[in-house]
A protein has these predicted regions:
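Structured-RNA-binding interfaces characteristic of tRNA pseudouridine synthases
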Residues: 5-8, 12-222
Length: 222
């Protein structure tokens, strides 16, 4: 009787340990930053990090704080920022994206979620970031682009812009570009590529489509 009781107690203890095992989950996040004061958590201000923390706490019942790869500024958008968090929740890693999207505002969408190594850190990993800056170069601005592109009237010398971009390639100290009090370990960054691309708009101000509607329907099997 005593031996069996000890065995059951050990099995129960093992089950508790397995249940509370901590996992690190990676989120790929897209968002429209116009309604937020940047990524980083701030008191009495709406931020991307704050919304993610709130949704995760509501979902798991745990006090969770995410760690992001890029702490974007106010009004900055992202197509695939990366964040991680630790949890003891038993929700399958790939299901977090679906569950969180039910709890997040419509301008923040989790594109994917997966489990990563416990020591993975989005700001310390050997990875590259891609930034895109859009310039709306035409006679009049377009309201549809007011939050996603910088309006510039006048003719741009594209070839001169491309030549100037070459000066930024390689490793440089970007301390002069940082805001006062920026908390970073180093201001040295390496630029691997920098391209200027022209994308024409139609007279109506919409991008020239790469494929017609008929081609899209064909791809959908219609």
């Amino acid at each position: 009787m005593i031996i069996r009781w000890n065995r059951i107690e050990a099995m129960n203890q093992k089950m508790i340990t397995q249940t509370k095992m901590t996992r690190r989950i990676l989120l790929r996040v897209a968002y429209d930053g116009m309604n937020y004061h940047g990524w980083q958590l701030q008191p009495n201000a709406a931020t991307i990090e704050g919304e993610l923390n709130r949704a995760l706490c509501a979902l798991t019942g745990e006090e969770i704080v995410v760690t992001g790869a890029s702490r974007t500024d106010a009004g900055v958008h992202a197509l695939g920022n990366v964040a991680v968090f630790d949890t003891t929740s038993r929700i399958p890693a790939e299901k977090f994206s679906y569950a969180l999207n039910q709890r997040l505002p419509e301008d923040i969408v989790i594109q994917s979620s997966k489990q990563v190594a416990d020591d993975f850190h989005p700001r310390h990993c050997d990875c590259r970031k891609t930034y895109e800056y859009d310039i709306l170069n035409r006679t009049f601005p377009l309201p549809a682009y007011r939050n996603t592109a910088y309006f510039l009237y006048g003719t741009l010398n594209i070839e001169a812009m491309r030549r100037a971009c070459q000066a930024f390639l390689g490793e440089h100290d970007f301390a002069s570009f940082c805001a006062a009090g920026a908390q970073v370990q180093t201001t040295v960054r390496k630029i691997y590529s920098l391209e200027v691309e022209c994308r024409p708009l139609t007279e109506a101000g919409t991008p020239v489509p790469p494929a017609s509607g008929e081609a899209v329907n064909a791809a959908d099997g219609k």
